[in-house]
Amino acid sequence: GELRKMLTAIGSTRRWRSLKRLLNKEKREQDLQDERRIIAPLMLACMNMARKKTGALIAIQQGIDLTPFAHTGEVFRAEVNARLVENIFFKNSPLHDGAMVIADNSIIAAGCILPVAYNTDLNKDLGLRHRSALGLSQETDAKIIIISEERGRISFAYRGEIHQDITTDELQLLLEG
């Protein structure tokens, strides 16, 4: 009886392991789907804000926790939908000047203050919004979208680099990447 119990135990741990692997794979795929789900409303909001020349700064958490930055602004939790994103950055909104922070596929804060990149020759022509995006991208692995008020141009900062004046197609690729 002992041998059979042992073999049964071995079999069940093996089964358990493959089940766990399957569940983890499903969770990863679900996470990816959830991440993809926020891209469409973000894209729509960005296209509208760029067209209306509404300035915006949106930081999307990746691996490194953005909670400390979220707490520099107004903390709340809301689903990512285009109208809400646009309303927050609307000129008369009390939160329009700061950054929006997105984590776990939800908006977790707005009106946040981000660390500003040092002034270098590289970014001497950048405005405060772009320098803040660059600063956060130097300190974290967040993906950051910037929309300029002046020209309604879309830029994207990631890992200390800023891609300026990109198309919405390019933005989508950078968000999905």
Give the role of each language-model region.
Residues G1-G177:
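Divalent-cation
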